[in-house]
């Protein structure tokens, strides 16, 4: 199948019209930025966060040039105080947070016998603990209001074994469990928590941290013979963030034919 980079979704649907959306790891050209753009196209007011301040500023400027209401603030999800500052900033701009999209994650390639404690802990602190911190902060705001949506970025490796991915797979499996359990805790308040699990999405971060031979192998496993484009994952996130998925909570949507 042709690897088209041109989105073919209908525009102007306003699925998130007026919603206040916060997205972590949203700078650059990956899933986070694609999600920010799609949310803005659907009428949302969007706050981007990232640890890369220059890329963040460029991403915000790019979206603002299209007349979207977009802001940016640096945030390291491994630091609880910065996560709280992120929520506080969003509330100062939007008066509320309707949707929290937890996209921050960290991977790598290392067999367990060669992995240091530091490598293991770094991946889990960003990918799992960071998602927990953002989910917790968002729920503390949303539950009293009895409304809100959280969407987490998981991965099919949370279901499926893969060599060299013990740390990342454990973290993403944890994100899935966190999604299910927090969804149960928040359901009485009408707050929904779901996740998307991409299989293989082509973006610069993955290309930077992965073995090229592994990427070729992963691409060959895909039924379409290619990785997903970031906007293709972003469309699923928009669906989960919108009222179209209003009766879904605690679910992890596989963006692949390979589950599990």
Describe every region a protein language model picked out.
Residues 13-47:
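Canonical Rossmann dinucleotide-binding motif of NAD(H)/NADP(H)-dependent dehydrogenases/reductases
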Residues 111-112, 119-124, 206, 214, ...:
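Substrate-binding pocket helix/loop in short-chain dehydrogenase/reductase
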């Amino acid at each position: 199948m042709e690897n088209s980079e041109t989105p073919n979704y209908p525009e102007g649907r306003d699925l998130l019209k007026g919603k206040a959306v916060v997205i972590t790891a949203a700078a650059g050209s990956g899933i986070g930025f694609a999600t920010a753009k799609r949310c803005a196209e659907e009428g949302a007011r969007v706050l981007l966060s990232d640890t890369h301040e220059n890329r963040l500023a460029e991403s915000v400027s790019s979206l603002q040039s299209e007349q979207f209401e977009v802001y940016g603030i640096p945030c390291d999800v491994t630091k609880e105080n910065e996560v709280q500052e992120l929520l506080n900033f969003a509330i100062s701009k939007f008066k509320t947070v309707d949707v929290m999209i937890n996209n921050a994650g960290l991977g790598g390639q290392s067999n367990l016998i060669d992995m240091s404690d530091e490598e293991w802990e770094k991946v889990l602190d960003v990918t799992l603990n960071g998602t927990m911190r953002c989910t917790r902060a968002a729920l503390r705001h949303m539950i009293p209001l009895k409304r809100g949506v959280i969407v987490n970025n998981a991965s099919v490796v949370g279901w499926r074994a893969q060599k060299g991915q013990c740390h990342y797979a454990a973290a993403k499996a944890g994100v899935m469990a966190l999604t299910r359990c927090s969804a149960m805790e928040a359901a009485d308040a009408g707050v929904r928590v779901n996740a998307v699990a991409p299989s293989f999405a082509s973006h610069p971060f993955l290309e930077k941290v992965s073995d090229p031979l592994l990427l070729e192998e992963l691409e060959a496993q895909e039924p379409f013979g290619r990785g997903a484009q970031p906007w293709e994952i972003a469309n699923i996130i928009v669906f989960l963030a919108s009222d179209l998925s209003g009766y879904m909570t605690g679910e992890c949507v596989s963006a692949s034919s390979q589950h599990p």
